Amino acid sequence: MSFAEKITGLLARPNQQQDPAGGPEAPWYLKYGSRLLGIVGAFFAILFGLWNVLSIITLSVSCLVAGIIQMIAGFVVMALEAPCCFVCIDQVNVMADKLDAKPMYFRAGLYCALAVPPIFMCFGLASLFGSGLIFATGVVYGMMALGKKASAADMRAAAQQTDYGGNAATSQAATTSDRAGIVNNAQPFSFTGAVGTDSNV
């Protein structure tokens, strides 16, 4: 068993389907890397949320509320990414399975929306780092929702079928001249001599 298979076995859930949402298949390192980033980000969000809650000593109510929201966001992300951490709560697996059935952009939007309020309420290193990791997890899930880019041959074929305006290419031959412009009737600049309207003053 290779190292990659061991890592994917540790991060896989029991009875997990290949791609329940029917979206594009993501590479294994991106799929399990996003899950690992979510788990680590949730842990640090809980930890730094607790640090923000302790700011009640300085009578900062906005940081107290931001810390509570950050801790709740950390618990939600931890429950969705690693439901094995909440074995005592029966509904966590059901909630995680329901979210796995939804498209990946739904999870990306949820994580980004959970991460933003603590940063705006109490801007500091604790809220920036804790919620920033959850936001980064949402960004990775958003990239996975976009899917793989096309092969180089497919992109080349698509570029040859359309011109600069996005319309179908006309019968004019494409030019690779250095002096070619976007506008077909444009006159080149004169590189020798003065401009015709120059008064030479």
Swiss-Prot record:
The keyword Cell membrane applies. It holds the Pfam family Cg6151-P. Its main location: membrane. SMART domains: Cg6151-P. Channel activity is inhibited by La(3+), which reduces Ca(2+) influx and thus inhibits it's function in promoting activity-dependent bulk endocytosis (ADBE) in response to high stimuli. It is a multi-pass membrane protein. It is found in: Cell membrane; Cytoplasmic vesicle, Secretory vesicle, Synaptic vesicle membrane; Presynaptic cell membrane; Endosome. Keywords: Calcium, Calcium channel, Calcium transport, Cell membrane, Cell projection, Cytoplasmic vesicle, Endocytosis, Endosome, Ion channel, Ion transport, Membrane, Synapse, Transmembrane, Transmembrane helix, Transport. GO terms for molecular function: calcium channel activity; identical protein binding. InterPro entries: TVP18/Ca-channel_flower. GO terms for cellular component: cell projection; endosome; presynaptic membrane; synaptic vesicle membrane. It comes from the Eukaryota. The record marks E81 as: Calcium ion selectivity. GO terms for biological process: bulk synaptic vesicle endocytosis; cell competition in a multicellular organism; clathrin-dependent synaptic vesicle endocytosis; photoreceptor cell differentiation; positive regulation of neuron apoptotic process; positive regulation of presynaptic cytosolic calcium concentration; synaptic vesicle endocytosis. Transmembrane protein which mediates synaptic endocytosis, fitness-based cell culling, neuronal culling, morphogen gradient scaling, and calcium transport. Regulates synaptic endocytosis and hence couples exo- with endocytosis. Controls two major modes of synaptic vesicle (SV) endocytosis in the synaptic boutons of neuromuscular junctions (NMJs); Ca(2+) channel-independent Clathrin-mediated endocytosis (CME) in response to mild stimulation, and Ca(2+) channel-dependent activity-dependent bulk endocytosis (ADBE) in response to strong stimulation. Belongs to the calcium channel flower family. Homomultimer. Associates with the dally/ magu complex. This is Calcium channel flower. It comes from Drosophila willistoni. The gene is flower.
